[in-house]
């Protein structure tokens, strides 16, 4: 099941999220907006399993990567409010 993966401009290009992803959803692409001259990209969101390891690995105060689980997935995982 694919999940929505959003990359925000708080990305510092550290590659932590890319290394944390067990399904290789993320990759780094050239970007001049940060010191590292690269930013995370999510070209293979269909492979995202929703583990949120990328979110946990992100060192920025405001997460650069967010995985959005659909309502049905959230309920089935017992995460619904």
Swiss-Prot record:
Its cofactor is [4Fe-4S] cluster. InterPro entries: 4Fe4S_Fe-S-bd (IPR017896), 4Fe4S_Fe_S_CS (IPR017900), PSI_iron-sulfur_center (IPR050157), PSI_PsaC (IPR017491). Keywords: 4Fe-4S, Chloroplast, Electron transport, Iron, Iron-sulfur, Membrane, Metal-binding, Oxidoreductase, Photosynthesis, Photosystem I, Plastid, Repeat, Thylakoid, Transport. [4Fe-4S] cluster 2 binds at residues 21, 48, 51, 54. Pfam families: Fer4_21. The keyword Glycoprotein does not apply. Residues 2-31, 39-68 form the 4Fe-4S ferredoxin-type domain. It catalyses: reduced [plastocyanin] + hnu + oxidized [2Fe-2S]-[ferredoxin] = oxidized [plastocyanin] + reduced [2Fe-2S]-[ferredoxin]. One of its GO terms (cellular component) is photosystem I. Binds 2 [4Fe-4S] clusters. Cluster 2 is most probably the spectroscopically characterized electron acceptor FA and cluster 1 is most probably FB. It is a peripheral membrane protein. Its main location: plastid. It comes from the Eukaryota. [4Fe-4S] cluster 1 binds at residues 11, 14, 17, 58. It is an enzyme of class 1 (oxidoreductase). GO terms for molecular function: 4 iron, 4 sulfur cluster binding; electron transfer activity; metal ion binding; oxidoreductase activity. GO terms for biological process: photosynthetic electron transport in photosystem I. Its EC number is 1.97.1.12. It is found in: Plastid, Chloroplast thylakoid membrane. The eukaryotic PSI reaction center is composed of at least 11 subunits. PANTHER family: PHOTOSYSTEM I IRON-SULFUR CENTER, PHOTOSYSTEM I IRON-SULFUR CENTER-RELATED. Apoprotein for the two 4Fe-4S centers FA and FB of photosystem I (PSI); essential for photochemical activity. FB is the terminal electron acceptor of PSI, donating electrons to ferredoxin. The C-terminus interacts with PsaA/B/D and helps assemble the protein into the PSI complex. Required for binding of PsaD and PsaE to PSI. PSI is a plastocyanin-ferredoxin oxidoreductase, converting photonic excitation into a charge separation, which transfers an electron from the donor P700 chlorophyll pair to the spectroscopically characterized acceptors A0, A1, FX, FA and FB in turn. This is Photosystem I iron-sulfur center.
């Amino acid at each position: 099941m694919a999940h929505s993966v959003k990359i925000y401009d708080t990305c510092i290009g550290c590659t932590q999220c890319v290394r944390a992803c067990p399904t290789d959803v993320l990759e780094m692409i050239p970007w001049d907006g940060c010191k590292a001259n690269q930013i995370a990209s999510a070209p293979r969101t269909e492979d995202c399993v929703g583990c949120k390891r990328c979110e946990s690995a992100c060192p920025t105060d405001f997460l650069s990567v967010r995985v959005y689980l659909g309502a049905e997935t959230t309920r089935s995982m017992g995460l619904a409010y």
